[in-house]
């Protein structure tokens, strides 16, 4: 996958992406609409409920596999986010069933970001309050988050710790890591 952003001469800002997926998989994509106030919950590797939250912002997006796994979306405040495949570079915290109440599945990070935050700064200030874990060990991800102002960051989790990079280039692909970009 490749994500790009462009700023026009008049200052308008556009984000776009491609989704290429190999291995003969069918992504089962569908449009997703999440209204303000909807109650949501994260999956966990054990099958128990993880983090539970209510949508503060309405969201539209495109999912993969199931509607909770939003690959790319935007909320009513203008915050957008997308996930990108990141195998061999990142690494999440191990799942701890005793902390399920703050556990967020990696494939649901976009859903959580877009329903909870209006800005990148709000997200950065809150990220340590959740534990992002893999539902499938081989599917490590990294994320692109953008504001309507044109500010964009990339979030990567390495060694269980989130790292944010200002993305002034406006491009992100799957692996390798953002510093390579």
Residue ranges: model-predicted function:
Residues 140-181:
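Extended amphipathic alpha-helical segments with heptad-repeat/coiled-coil character used for oligomerization
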Residues 83, 118, 143-144:
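Noncatalytic scaffold domains of N-terminal-nucleophile
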Residues 122-144, 151:
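Secretory/export targeting leaders with adjacent low-complexity proregions
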Residues 7-9, 99-131:
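Alpha/propeptide regions of enzymes that mature by internal proteolysis
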Residues 1-98, 137:
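A contiguous strand-loop segment
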Residues 18-20, 86, 128, 148, ...:
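An acidic- and aromatic-residue-enriched active-site/binding cleft used to recognize and process polar
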Residues 28-31, 38-42, 99, 105-108, ...:
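Glycine-rich loops and low-complexity Gly/Arg-rich segments
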């Amino acid at each position: 996958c490749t994500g790009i952003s462009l700023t026009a001469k008049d200052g308008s800002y556009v984000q776009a992406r491609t989704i290429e997926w190999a291995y003969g998989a069918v992504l089962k994509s569908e449009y997703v609409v999440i209204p303000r106030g909807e109650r949501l919950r994260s999956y966990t590797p054990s099958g128990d409920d993880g983090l539970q939250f209510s949508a503060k912002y309405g969201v539209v997006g495109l999912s993969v596999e199931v509607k909770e796994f939003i690959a790319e979306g935007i909320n009513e405040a203008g915050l957008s986010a997308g996930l990108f495949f990141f195998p061999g570079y990142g690494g999440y915290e191990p799942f701890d069933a005793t902390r399920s109440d703050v556990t967020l599945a990696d494939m649901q990070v976009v859903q959580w970001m877009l329903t909870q935050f209006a800005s990148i700064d709000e997200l950065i200030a809150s990220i340590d309050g959740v534990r992002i874990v893999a539902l499938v060990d081989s599917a490590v991800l990294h994320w692109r988050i953008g504001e309507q102002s044109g500010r964009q960051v990339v979030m990567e989790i390495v060694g269980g710790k989130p790292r944010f990079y200002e993305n002034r280039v406006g491009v992100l692909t799957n692996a390798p890591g953002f510093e390579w970009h």
